[in-house]
Amino acid sequence: MAKNLGLPVLEIQHHYAHILSCMAENETSDPVIGVSFDGTGYGTDGTIWGGEFLRADYNGFDRIGSVEPFLQVGGDASAREGWRIAVSILYRHTRDREKTKRMASALQLCDAQNLQAQFLLSDRNINTVVSTSAGRLFDAVSAILGIRRTSTFEGEASTALQFAAQNGRIRRGQTNASDRPLREENGRFVLPTEELVWELAQRKLRGEDSEQLALEFHEALAAGIIWGCERAREETGLSAAALSGGVFQNTLLLEFCLTGLEERGFRVYRHHMIPPNDGGIALGQAAAAMWVLNRKKE
């Protein structure tokens, strides 16, 4: 509409807007390590983002890290059916149809017909997109652990996974996440989340408790976020981290991240009044526009 009216248009990338909204709420214009974790948003490279580490300020951003890319198969259905993401990650890890078929059957992820369709779409690259969505990882783990294989509303599977983790914490207390070193890929660091999902699937098949595994997933992902911020600090010299995106509505993950980052000397910005999900993006966009307008006046 603005273009049709001949008005200037300022385009702000989705995950960058999340970080700007957190910066605006906390009244800072200093550069930050932005941790933008959510369900879905278009990246600048044509893939789906959602588990991003950004070096960000009001002048722009650089993508310096992410969760491990996976193939999101099935279009919009994959956002509702976490088993699709689970199968995709397991298939990517094994690169073997028969092995993946046995695991998917044992985990009761889907029926044989749907599984064959997943293989076909993946192998022929039909209705697929590369994704780094942290939200979809929650859906995949929820499916693997038998908590929720599908969602009837946004965030159902991931919320159920959080509740399971909280129950596991109450019953058994907190554990310590094992070390999974970061690696380099296409000029950025990558959290080894594929290995994490694979390990959880193996342990579930050995009969380990789903609630305890849900807790360990939260701990491991928080540890990965902390390691990512430490790596970003080494690269950028920044010690301020801004946590935003719908995944940080998960209070358990947020708690683990806040505790770990503050113990390591980070100044952590988080949301208090503005929602971390897409409900807060408009603030980030407006703050960016105000910054640009003020610069033009100077």
What spans do the regions from the language model cover?
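Conserved phosphate-binding/catalytic loops in two-lobed NTP-binding clefts
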Residues: 6-18, 239-244, 251, 257-281
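Conserved phosphate-binding catalytic cores of ATP/NTP-utilizing and phosphoryl-transfer enzymes
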Residues: 11-34
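Short glycine-aspartate micro-motif
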Residues: 32-36, 131, 242
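Glycine-rich beta-strand-to-loop/alpha-helix junction loops that act as flexible
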Residues: 39, 134, 241-248
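Flexible glycine/proline-rich, aromatic-decorated loop/lid segments
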Residues: 42-43, 47-67, 107-112, 117, ...
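A contiguous, well-structured pocket-lining segment that forms one wall/lid of small-molecule binding clefts
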Residues: 88-239, 252-258
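Acidic, glycine/GT-rich loop-and beta-edge segments that sit at the periphery of enzyme/chaperone cores
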Residues: 98-106, 286-298
